[in-house]
């Protein structure tokens, strides 16, 4: 809801992300001496080799980790990002999907492939291989690695990844790395707000025009 509220002009990221940014910096002392030397694959490999006790990452990383150490016993828990137990939520999101174009000349064949891929038994194979959580309702067996998240999954207490709303032009990944190196909360938040208004201006204009037109609905 944060991105929507910012687009509506009701708040800004300087206000909404300040506490988060400060807590983000607090994680640095618990990492390696030079955390910026690690790429994604490097971090997965280091964790697989026992160079760290915990790894703040999503369940999607487990196939990469297990490719290095198949016998590693991995467990998980939901990051306690709030001081209030009731406010805790599981970050999750759909980043894989299928589609058939409107101009497809072989739609029946394409739909047959999709029906095959989305059959329960094939979804279960994908779950087993990728340690994934299905988007399709059904009696699927999740990996024991997800036991620490199961309560949230079964309750539907999940919140979409914020980066699904970030314009790619903002290069938020680079902004975050710069922030962690410089550790200047004010500069990071100021740039984030400025870039959001710049690269998201068309959506902001449409959202505010819509809300103005439908304010009494």
Give the ranges of each region predicted by the language model.
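Conserved C-terminal helix/tail region of periplasmic/extracytoplasmic solute-binding proteins
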Residues: 154-217
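Extracytoplasmic/periplasmic substrate-recognition and gating elements
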Residues: 29, 66-129
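Beta->alpha turn/N-cap motifs
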Residues: 40, 57-62, 94-96
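Stable alpha-helical elements in mature extracytoplasmic
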Residues: 16-24, 43, 61, 106-110, ...
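Short helix-initiation/N-cap motifs at beta->coil->alpha
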Residues: 35-48
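Alpha-to-beta junction loops
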Residues: 49-57
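Glycine-centered hinge/linker elements that transmit conformational signals in sensory
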Residues: 3-37, 79
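Periplasmic solute-binding protein
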Residues: 1-5, 87, 92-101, 167-177
